[in-house]
């Protein structure tokens, strides 16, 4: 087929991203990461797995990033919703700093956050729900940008997966509009 390499994202792990029990989620992701490590070790020059982390606490997140890096993973799939505060909080600065230090891109996938979650009920016809599945990635990007995360960590690499890209120019326009007109009262 002419495929030279593959980046492997979890499927079932997307559902577990929204599980409310962070201890359960952490155990599932640790087991998945061990399995994925073994699977990718058959052809490490061609198979690149994305480790999953639970982000139960920022300290756990740092440890999970370090463990994934030690296993040779080249990127991390993050849950859309952490357990402690939100991703713009400075309590996550050690996580972002660790990702930069280890050169690990952090990936946010559609359907893994509260906005556009896989189990959310769409408004109107079911097909309308398909239009909203990118919302979680939009929310993450707005949170990181307006929250100053990229100002504090300019070398942080973030990937939005299966969220298309057509929304980006309009979203940038909306962000500029919000900032220019509403930044003083919408902090």
Question: PLM ranges: what are they?
Answer:
Residues 2, 33, 109:
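Acidic active-site catalytic centers that drive phospho-/nucleotidyl reactions
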Residues 23-39:
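Active-site-proximal gating segment of KS-fold condensing enzymes and close homologs
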Residues 27, 41-48, 53, 58-187:
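Catalytic pocket-lining loop regions of alpha/beta-barrel enzymes
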